[in-house]
Amino acid sequence: WNPFKELERAGQRVRDAVISAAPAVATVGQAAAIARG
């Protein structure tokens, strides 16, 4: 068992989640800004 390998895998999962979530977050932020006027 290699803790560094496990950490690397977890980091990649987190990065993938952030990358896939970023556009949605930006869209929601834009919509909120437009709604506020």
From Swiss-Prot:
Residue positions where Glycine amide is found in the record: 37
Primary site of residence: secreted
Keyword Secreted included in the entry's annotation: yes
Record has Secreted as a keyword: yes
Compartment(s) where it occurs, according to its Swiss-Prot or TrEMBL record: Secreted
Protein keywords: Amidation, Antibiotic, Antimicrobial, Immunity, Innate immunity, Secreted
Superkingdom, taxonomy of origin: Eukaryota
GO biological-process terms attached to the record: antibacterial humoral response; defense response to Gram-positive bacterium; innate immune response
Role: Cecropins have lytic and antibacterial activity against several Gram-positive and Gram-negative bacteria.
Name of protein: Bactericidin B-2
Species this protein is from: Manduca sexta
